[in-house]
Amino acid sequence: MTKTNDLAEALIVERTFNAPVERVWTALTDVNEMRQWYFDLKEFKAESGFEFEFVVEHDGNTYHHLCRVTEVIPEKKIAYTWRYKGEPGDSLVTFELFPEGDRTRLKLTHTGIETFPKTPAYARKNFEAGWTAIVGSELKQFLEGSKAKP
């Protein structure tokens, strides 16, 4: 029996929000909304081939993210490549939306994490913690909290 390398397995984070799919889609694809819960993006368009970037400072290090939208199915799915300037590795982040009445289940899948440098900064547990906070806390608060739009 072969043991699968945990690092090579897709990272999946799922959450259900008290918001309709149209509202969640807008939060995932409108740059002005994304800046409020995601990252400080200069530009973003939900169009296949659109390239965007952003910089994150964490623990005294700077991480320059380079991304390219690869797939868009309005109100259902958006995917983009995710890599770091000057570092080896390529990954793919996919957001999928599933309507559940007036609620929406979001499934985030991040594949290719194992292609990044084998250093603590790029450890799978850091990606798990980051996506859990972004989707489970920041996006949830944005969609359901006191600043949420109807």
Predicted regions and their residues:
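A conserved amphipathic terminal alpha-helix motif
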Residues: 6, 112-150
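Residue-level signal for tight coil/turn positions that link beta-strands
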Residues: 8, 21, 49, 73-76, ...
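Hydrophobic pocket/interface hotspot
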Residues: 24, 34, 52-54, 69, ...
